[in-house]
Amino acid sequence: MAGHSKWANIKHKKAAADAKRGKIWTRLIKEITVAARLGGGDADSNPRLRLAMDKATDANMPKDNINRAIQRGVGGLEGANYEEIRYEGYGINGAAVIVDCLTDNRTRTVAEVRHGFDKYGGNMGTSGSVAFLFDHIGQFIFAPGTPEDKLMDAALEAGADDVITHDDGSLEVICPPHDFAKVKTALEAAGFKAELAEVIMKPQTEVVFTGEDAVKMQKLLDVLENLDDVQEVFTNAVIGE
């Protein structure tokens, strides 16, 4: 299946992540803690914990930090009790935005997220107002030059739904979220290391922004992403060059 260019966006995302590693560690510690609390401290039987631990390792987080977060989650250490909350809303020009949070203070978080939407012309909607515009998937992005046929064989055998070839030569493997850990392990065993591997809300259609609208929409997304309680921001907005 063919698709449009992804590689520049992936490289930008990785560079941005490297630039705010301290914040990423904080988010990952929260995610590890919640994953361990909900599914137990054994990563082999807890796919969500395995994914969070893999992300933490990729972000160069020390093992001690990871283990402490797991212990906090299973009740071995004291710490904040985080609650998962999803907010949905619209940016300018009807672009859909999903904001996933982990918080120990729902009142604070909803006020900050609402302010983020309002500040740059967006508005926060009700639960379910935009989620139907996205698909919940596991996603793996591979660099241009990755052998397509071999990757496709390994991915489909592992249980992936699709392999997409983008115009820039990068490859995208899509799988059901509940099979993410299994597919990731199988691909790595076959010698394929993804540049980006995550469970996401993927937009079914996109809204392309250019000029001043692009600047304004990017500012809205940046404000939301920089909130302390925000774990992930998903949008169907595509910011043009």
From Swiss-Prot:
A biological process term (GO) from this entry: regulation of DNA-templated transcription
SUPFAM superfamilies in alphabetical order: YebC-like (SSF75625)
Pfam families: TACO1_YebC_N (PF20772), Transcrip_reg (PF01709)
Keywords: Cytoplasm, DNA-binding, Transcription, Transcription regulation
Subcellular location: Cytoplasm
Keyword S-adenosyl-L-methionine annotated: no
A GO term for molecular function: DNA binding
GO terms for cellular component: cytosol
Principal cellular location given in the protein's record: cytoplasm
S-S bridge residues: none
Domain of life: Bacteria
PANTHER family, per database record: TRANSCRIPTIONAL REGULATORY PROTEIN YEBC-RELATED, TRANSLATIONAL ACTIVATOR OF CYTOCHROME C OXIDASE 1
NCBIfam families with a match to the protein in the record: PRK00110.1 (NF001030), PRK12378.1 (NF009044), YebC/PmpR family DNA-binding transcriptional regulator (TIGR01033)
Similarity-based family: Belongs to the TACO1 family.
HAMAP family the record matches: Transcrip_reg_TACO1
Protein name: Probable transcriptional regulatory protein Rpic_2388
Organism listed in the record: Ralstonia pickettii (strain 12J)
Taxonomic lineage from the root: Bacteria, Pseudomonadati, Pseudomonadota, Betaproteobacteria, Burkholderiales
